[in-house]
């Protein structure tokens, strides 16, 4: 569960390139596996009032969502929130792995290249598939 201070933290902010797409993952080890410009959200939720969400919205960078398969509904909620702010969102298929940390960097990069764009048109279809 997210602690009260997590919404005010952007993990590794000083090392992020805010002019390039970012990858959102759940934990620190997932971020290591995902490579450069990856941000652990330190849980499976990203609230609109969090510092990270606000910075993404302010910078307008594309987002690759690579949350654990058991957080599919939460990933779709995050995607919908980002879409409301005009952010381009891609969903990285992590299954059948438990999380990004179980993959090699090469496996993750391959899946990232194959990521599906999430749009208002495809959101309902992807939400239905997650049921």
Regions found by a protein language model. Name each.
Residues 1-61:
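Phosphate-handling DNA/RNA-contact segment within nucleic-acid enzymes
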